Amino acid sequence: MGTMTIDGRKVEFTDEKNVLTVIRKAGINIPTLCYHSEVSTFGACRLCTVEDDRGRTFASCSEEPRDGMVIYTNSGKIKKYRKLIVELLLAAHCRDCTTCVKSGECVLQELAHRLGVHNIRFQNTREQYEIDDSSPSLIRDPNKCILCGDCVRACEELQGIGALNFAYRGTEAIVIPAFNKKIAETQCVNCGQCRVYCPTGAISIKTHMDEVWEALADPDVRVVAQIAPAVRVAVGDHYSLPKGRSVMGKIVNALHRMGFDEIYDTTFSADLTIMEESAEFLKRVEKGEKLPLLTSCCPAWVKFITDQYKDYIPNLSTCRSPQGMMSAVIKEYFRDPENAKGKKTVMVSIMPCTAKKAEAIRPNSFTDEKQDTDIVITTTELLRMIDNFGLDFAQLEPEACDMPFGFGSGGGVIFGVTGGVTEAVLRRLSPDHSKETMREISECGVRGDEGIKEFTVPYKGMDINVCVASGLANARTVMERVKNGEANYHLIEVMACRRGCIMGGGQPVRAGDRTKAARAKGLYNADNTMLIKKSDENPMVLELYQGLLKGKEHKLLHNDFF
């Protein structure tokens, strides 16, 4: 604890880990390209450089605050220094900004404008590299890389994968997969966190918007959309609506106006997932086999297990993800000529997750060897489509989803935040429907920001040991403990992205804990407003089991990971 003088003003600090944090606490938005509080300090971009009263310059991100420090953040020397750094970065950077997918959201572009860089005095001598589009989810363009290392640290430290790293030195330095492999040839799980942390267009989402527009323009095609829970609390950010507010009704209106024929809510199939997964869990607990049960909703987590913990593949739940269940059910529904009305059905999935693109083409997620989810677009792609269509989103009136697959429970909505799957399972297993019981379940340890949460819940005279993890680095810690016999769980829920789908690789990029908290709160608020809290109380789900699903539960709702 102490006091610093920043640009002539006294600023107190307590437990801030670096000078940069204290400066921002003082209300000064000092620029950075390589600093993120969630990962280790790299100090490579030097944009956060400041000057002290002795004329010494240093990177504020890697300097600890000390009592009595006198800091100048915008001296003449510092301003020239920052401008020169950006100019040098741009000199070695692909500058096709008008056609770049990151245009308008690029941090480097914003800094060039902010610092007044209008002329590049230096020649670009950097080698041109081949664009890597081998991944079903992401595109890597090394020509737009500024060597900030954000993707490297996110992949290694947050996800524990290490698919990317630096190679070579000096002017030949580049970020690539090991042995210069294509990204699809590595252990990349398609989570998209590298794209979230990348400040430029060096890593971007592989878009499938053109396929959607093509389907919408075909009069012989019925275009059906499903919308994941986390999407509804992220779209509003783009239109300056309050952070985390659910805008599901506006999204439905926008999709109807763009020409989608049917729009369904993935919370419906989340309820199906809970029905199937809770039954599977109880069966395994009773038999005492294939425990712990590993949830299978997150495709990045599933790929992580199938790639790196093959001995635990039998522990994965055989349940399809909510996306997979919804697509299979809808395709089955429209196989009935009375429902099909002579049209081909194209299933479009709108997800917060880049890994869902990979899941959709995974052969073991098909039904009768046919792909159920035809196209997956992310929240970010949805925003571009809405903007492309010219809709004034903020002014749209809310509309309800279509039936019979447009209604879900509160348990289905909270799938979008870490711990939501487990909480919905616990609700399903509880015989008590009271508000007090629902509150007790929510307070048992299933909610919160911790990367690893462990708790025990009583069930029919036995203790159920549960672990909830978010971020694959945390998941690896959990799996190593299980593998070494250091932990004994009955149920493990993992979401590859920190805080869950609300911060997925396909979501609009908004830094900071406030965004995470607001999106999580938005889903919990949506849950609070729903009359039905438990998946087994959803009348549309119960009706489906008595009708379309009868005798087809395993075929449509489960898959085989072997």
List PLM regions with ranges:
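Short structural boundary motif marking the start of a folded domain
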Residues: 1-4
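Short strand-turn-strand beta-turns centered on an Asx-Gly dipeptide
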Residues: 6-9, 52-54
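A short N-terminal beta-strand-loop micro-motif at the entrance of redox/enzyme domains
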Residues: 9-15
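Charged, low-complexity surface patches
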Residues: 12, 134, 144, 187, ...
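Iron-sulfur-associated redox domains of electron-transfer enzymes in respiratory
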Residues: 15-68, 74, 78, 206-562
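Fe-S ferredoxin-like electron-transfer domains
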Residues: 46-190, 203-218, 222
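Conserved glycine-bearing catalytic or ligand-binding loops at nucleotide- and phosphate-handling centers
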Residues: 195
